[in-house]
């Protein structure tokens, strides 16, 4: 999230270099930078396991309730939602990385219980099934096959 200086407040004056988009200042009650970094690294490294909020709170050296509140302020969503979003992002990378990988293998690699759970969560967060997403975004297999592009017109 970025902040922009109100143009009316600087009418007739050039924008100082520091007033171009700047990072959002630290929000009151949010996680410290080191807590965000350690939490994100732990989540990314352990997506295939069952991650618990108690485990994440211990990494941030906070109580579960304080961690959950600070996490929501820092990330804009609860820890469980963030972890699920990261699992689906990992699933997207795996789906595109190898055409032969099954959705069951993808699910297990992302810490989901089975293919049905992957499909449910994928559809909920992305809006389409993993198979439909794969067909849309996969790379062309053969030289004669053109990539699928959204809103592309067919050349005549």
Q: Model segments located where?
A:
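Terminal helix-turn-helix DNA-binding modules in bacterial transcription factors
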Residues: 37, 41-45, 49-54, 74-113, ...
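N-terminal intrinsically disordered/low-complexity leader segments
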Residues: 1-28, 139-156
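Basic/polar phosphate-binding segments, predominantly the helix-turn-helix DNA-binding elements
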Residues: 10-26, 50-86, 107-132
């Amino acid at each position: 999230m970025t902040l922009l200086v109100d143009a009316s407040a600087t009418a007739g004056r050039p924008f100082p270099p520091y007033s171009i988009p700047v990072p959002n200042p630290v929000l009151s009650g949010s996680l410290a930078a080191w807590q965000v970094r350690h939490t994100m690294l732990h989540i990314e490294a352990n997506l295939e396991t069952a991650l618990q909020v108690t485990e994440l709170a211990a990494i941030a050296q906070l109580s579960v309730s304080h961690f959950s509140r600070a996490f929501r302020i820092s990330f804009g969503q609860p820890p469980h939602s963030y972890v699920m979003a990261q699992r689906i992002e990992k699933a997207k990378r795996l789906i595109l990385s190898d055409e032969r990988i099954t959705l069951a293998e993808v699910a297990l690699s992302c810490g989901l219980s089975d293919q049905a759970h992957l499909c449910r969560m994928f559809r909920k967060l992305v809006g389409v099934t993993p198979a439909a997403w794969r067909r849309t975004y996969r790379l062309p297999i053969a030289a004669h096959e053109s990539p699928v592009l959204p809103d592309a017109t067919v050349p005549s």
